[in-house]
């Protein structure tokens, strides 16, 4: 297998907090897939959860070589966790089609956060 794409994104959590303060859950509704939205509603640290998901989705779109455009939407990238808590990506719609067209067989996710920032890296392998 070969690396077909790499994307990294860093998000200042305070910026996400400011958007949520101004517009309520509008950003979360636009960014989160349905399963993520349900987790968001009950999460103890909603802003941090949203910032981390945002970072992963931006990194994934960069790994596909497009960013969020050309028919891609944030909600087409769903972040889930395995039984050990490791993040993984599930692609839907145009994101899944694009990954298949590019020959991407797997996406590897690294996600980190600390007090001020959330950072994600996605490697596309095929």
Swiss-Prot record:
One GO cellular component term noted in the UniProt record for this chain: cytoplasm
Binding site for Mg(2+): 9, 58
Gene Ontology molecular function terms on file: holo-[acyl-carrier-protein] synthase activity; magnesium ion binding
Pfam family, one: ACPS
GO biological process entries: fatty acid biosynthetic process
InterPro entries: 4-PPantetheinyl_Trfase_dom, 4-PPantetheinyl_Trfase_dom_sf, ACPS, Ppantetheine-prot_Trfase_dom
Catalytic activity line of the entry: apo-[ACP] + CoA = holo-[ACP] + adenosine 3',5'-bisphosphate + H(+)
Cofactor: Mg(2+)
Keywords: Cytoplasm, Fatty acid biosynthesis, Fatty acid metabolism, Lipid biosynthesis, Lipid metabolism, Magnesium, Metal-binding, Transferase
Documented EC number(s): 2.7.8.7
Function: Transfers the 4'-phosphopantetheine moiety from coenzyme A to a Ser of acyl-carrier-protein.
NCBIfam families in alphabetical order: acpS, pantethn_trn
Protein name, entry field: Holo-[acyl-carrier-protein] synthase
């Amino acid at each position: 297998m070969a690396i077909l794409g790499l994307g990294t994104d860093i998000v200042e959590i305070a910026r996400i907090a400011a958007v949520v303060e101004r517009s309520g859950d509008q950003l979360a509704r636009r960014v989160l897939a349905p399963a993520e939205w349900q987790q968001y509603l009950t999460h103890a640290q909603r802003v941090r959860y949203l910032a981390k998901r945002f970072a992963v989705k931006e990194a994934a779109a960069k790994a596909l070589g497009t960013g969020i455009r050309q028919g891609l939407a944030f909600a087409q990238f769903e972040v889930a966790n395995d039984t050990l808590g490791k993040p993984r990506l599930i692609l839907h719609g145009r994101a899944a089609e694009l990954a298949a067209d590019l020959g991407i067989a797997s996406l590897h996710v690294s996600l980190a956060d600390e007090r001020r920032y959330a950072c994600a890296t996605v490697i596309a392998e095929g």
